[in-house]
Amino acid sequence: MRKILKIVSLLILLLLLVYSFFSPNSQLFVFVQLIIIAFLIGFGINCFVKKERYQGTLYFVIAICNITINLDKINELIQSI
């Protein structure tokens, strides 16, 4: 049941990401990116708890790459608040 819930929530996030990518509102895109980064960090911590270090490291690397790619947009969002 938990796996189905994770898959459904990730699919909803994917749809939100695609929608926000084509919408003129860039803040929505950054918010969705931050939510995805939070999920990736959570999955990475969960993998480290389960002693799956390779997958945990992979989640953290993907999250860090996502942060560095969108760093300018994140800074713009923080300054606009």
From Swiss-Prot:
- Name recorded for this polypeptide: Uncharacterized protein YosU
Cell compartment(s), UniProt: Cell membrane
Membrane topology term: Single-pass type I membrane protein
UniProt organism field: Bacillus subtilis (strain 168)
Q: Which residues lie on this side of the membrane: Cytoplasmic?
A: 50-81
Q: One GO CC annotation, please?
A: plasma membrane
What stretches pass through the bilayer?
Answer: 29-49
Mind listing the UniProt keywords for this protein, alphabetically?
A: Cell membrane, Membrane, Signal, Transmembrane, Transmembrane helix
The residue spans the entry assigns to the Extracellular side of the membrane are as follows 25-28
Residues spanning the signal sequence: 1-24
